[in-house]
Amino acid sequence: MKNMNKILGLALMVFSAFSCTAQLNPVSWSFSATKVADKTYEVKMVATMQTNWHLYSQKQPEDAIAIPTAFTFSPNPLFKLDDNIKEIGKMEVMKDPTLGVSANQYSKTVTFVQRIKLKANVKTSFNGNVEYQTCDDKKCLPPKTVNFSVAIK
């Protein structure tokens, strides 16, 4: 009976650890597309962070150790990418004098916008993924990848 209690106690600790880790998801993403001109769309990728959490910009200073947010788009012969991804939000420059590093980051929300131009008036989808790292003032979580698909109508 003592062995059974030890096993149950150990199992409870293991599952509790997984449960706590699974709850740490401080960034939520939404994806949408808006027609802005004939055959031209803006795909918006919006990150919303929980209080005290930060998401890093695509562009980081040379002394940064933060992992920048990066997007990968699936090739699609029906459209071409038009310009680079724009970031819309209040960028903060974080400086840590103890470590001698800095980072470009966002709190609360940031919108990434990629313009695309269709080669013809067709329905298609814009697929890809975003890899990002998020931190609060005490810890950073490992990089995470989120896949997405946005209908282009």
Go through the PLM ranges and name each one.
Residues M1-N25:
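Bacterial Sec-dependent N-terminal signal peptides
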